[in-house]
Regions:
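Polyanionic (Asp/Glu-rich) segments that form extended negatively charged tracts
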Residues: 1-2
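Short secondary-structure subsegments characteristic of cysteine-rich extracellular domains
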Residues: 6-24
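Non-catalytic, well-ordered alpha-helical scaffold segments
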Residues: 13-14, 18, 91-94, 141-144
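Residues that form generic nucleotide/phosphate-binding pockets
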Residues: 19, 47, 165-166
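Hydrophobic alpha-helical segments
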Residues: 23-26, 127, 150-153, 157
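Intrinsically disordered, low-complexity N-proximal targeting/linker segments that flank membranes
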Residues: 24-121, 129
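Histidine-centered nuclease catalytic patch
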Residues: 111-142, 158-159
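Short Cys/His-centered divalent metal-binding micro-motifs
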Residues: 139-168
């Protein structure tokens, strides 16, 4: 429901981008996701019918009410679990990490909608290595999406050693 021409396009895209990131980084959809998303959709749809809508009244859309649904803070993001789980915030962290293309470490291929279906979750700092020093590894900040082939080549290698190998090639 984005128009094709005019300033309204930019305003609509800005609103929808803010909505998407808010969906990832607030707890609005942790419970009753379908009914809350539908409620937000209805308000967004009504708001966009008025071509002169402004940023000033975004908080009429429930997800933008920062008193009720504040954005995640840095501590919360640092503690976000493994993105393969069901959590919205975890997947949001991975979405941010992938925002600029999610290039594979080895073949430098950019993730696309098609290729990402075949990528694997990879620990930047290997699970086994972190377990040896009794550090939890299943955090979104320790995750990337890479090809299966790259994942097998990297294996349990120390990240510094792997990066040195990549640079020497």
């Amino acid at each position: 429901f984005i128009p094709e021409h005019g300033d309204f396009v930019a305003k609509s895209e800005k609103l929808l981008r803010a909505y998407l990131w808010s969906a990832f980084f607030t707890n609005r959809y942790e419970n009753s996701a379908a009914s809350r998303a539908f409620a937000d959709y209805n308000v967004l749809k009504e708001k966009k019918k008025k071509k002169d809508f402004s940023d000033d009244n975004w908080d009429i859309v429930p997800i933008f009410n920062r008193d009720e649904y504040p954005l995640s803070n840095t501590d919360s993001l640092a503690e976000a679990g493994w993105p393969k789980s069901v959590g919205i915030e975890e997947r949001g962290v991975l979405a941010v990490a992938s925002y600029f293309g999610a290039y594979d470490f080895a073949d430098n291929r950019q993730a696309t909608f098609e290729s990402i279906q075949h990528r694997e979750y990879h620990h930047l700092f290997p699970d086994a290595l972190l377990k040896e020093i009794e550090v939890k590894s299943l955090y979104a900040m320790n995750c990337s999406l890479i090809t299966w082939k790259t994942n097998r080549v990297i294996g349990r290698k120390d990240p510094i050693e792997y990066l040195k190998e990549r640079v020497e090639l």
